[in-house]
């Protein structure tokens, strides 16, 4: 396995570990999710370019579209929670309340 694949997989694992460690803050979770999506984008692009798969050139672009949608929804949720409660702690929120 080339070293760049190892670096990308290590970046994904680090972002996933960050999601597990910093799951009490919404902003930290969103940043770690963005890191995971970026490493998945780089990994899928490298695999497609190394395998010369001309059929699936659209897959990394589709992944970026979903990452942008996830970021927009996450930031909207962060703004809503910050305006409503004044903090971004996930453990203090109860989404079952009206």
Curated annotation (Swiss-Prot):
Protein localization: Mitochondrion inner membrane
Entry keyword Secreted: no
Alphabetized UniProt keyword annotations: Electron transport, Membrane, Mitochondrion, Mitochondrion inner membrane, NAD, Respiratory chain, Translocase, Transmembrane, Transmembrane helix, Transport, Ubiquinone
Matching InterPro entries: NADH_UbQ_OxRdtase_chain4L/K (IPR001133), NUOK/Mnh_C1-like (IPR039428)
Main location: mitochondrion
Domain of life: Eukaryota
GO CC terms of this entry: mitochondrial inner membrane; respiratory chain complex I
Residues annotated as transmembrane: 2-22, 29-49, 61-81
A single MF term (Gene Ontology): NADH dehydrogenase (ubiquinone) activity
Pfam family, one: Oxidored_q2
Biological process terms in GO annotation: ATP synthesis coupled electron transport
Reactions mediated catalytically: a ubiquinone + NADH + 5 H(+)(in) = a ubiquinol + NAD(+) + 4 H(+)(out)
The protein's Enzyme Commission number: 7.1.1.2
Described purpose of this protein according to its UniProt entry: Core subunit of the mitochondrial membrane respiratory chain NADH dehydrogenase (Complex I) which catalyzes electron transfer from NADH through the respiratory chain, using ubiquinone as an electron acceptor. Part of the enzyme membrane arm which is embedded in the lipid bilayer and involved in proton translocation.
Family: Belongs to the complex I subunit 4L family.
Record-given protein name: NADH-ubiquinone oxidoreductase chain 4L
Originating organism: Avahi occidentalis (Western woolly lemur)
């Amino acid at each position: 396995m080339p070293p760049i694949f190892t670096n990308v997989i290590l970046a994904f694992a680090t972002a996933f570990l960050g999601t597990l460690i910093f799951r009490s803050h919404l902003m930290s979770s969103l940043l770690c999710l963005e890191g995971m999506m970026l490493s998945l984008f780089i990994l899928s692009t490298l695999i497609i370019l190394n395998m010369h798969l001309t059929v699936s050139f659209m897959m990394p672009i589709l992944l970026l579209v979903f990452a942008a949608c996830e970021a927009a929804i996450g930031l909207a949720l962060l703004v809503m929670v910050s305006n409503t409660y004044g903090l971004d702690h996930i453990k203090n929120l109860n989404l079952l309340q009206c």
